[in-house]
Amino acid sequence: MWRRVFAMWGHSKKRISAGLRLSGAGGLSFLCLCLFGGSALAEFESPKSEYFTGFEASDNYASGYVGAGYALGKAGLYEPGFRLRAVGAYGRYRYDGALLTDHGYVPATFDGEDAFLAALAGYQFRTGRLITKLFAGIEAEDQHIVPHDPNNSVQGSALGLRLQQETWLDISPRFYLSADASYGTAFHEYCALSRLGFRATHRFALGLEGGALGNEEYDAGRAGGFLRLN
């Protein structure tokens, strides 16, 4: 699962938002959309590379991402072993605030753009139906807001360390649970997301998700639904 954190407010606030996420894949396998991965059914042959993409939208933002992963060594993606992953994302968002003028503070609407790249290395553990992945790497992010918001520190370009953990549990052939968390030092962004999914077919799944996310400027909650296409 991959989730970007946007700077939506000039002052720290708490917020609950709802949205819909659509994820899909091309190539050999699918990886679910805060750079998060997914799993596949064990009866399929395990490939060594994967390509994934996704899109999500809410009331004040929309974002998309693309990425790829590779399993090092002789084992495939669904077996224990070392992993490499690269992800790029782009998003646009809008929020309301205020600007200081000669006549005092006046209401203003800010439009933001966020571009993000990350390169990670990690290891996948597998015990029965449970898969756990641990990643670490570097991230680069650029936040651009128009007009410039002097009250928002999440602007400009930054490099940082990224840490990430992913878990996936097949409850049954139809149902699965996932729980993921990440933290990046570029703008001190964090994300934690849990999902309950239902496989309608081998190529289509849907379900519910909820979690928390934020950065050095704001904290928020998220609840919504998702669709997954293999």
Which residues make up each language-model segment?
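Transmembrane beta-strand segments that form the barrel wall of outer-membrane beta-barrel proteins
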Residues: 47-58, 136, 140, 173-185, ...
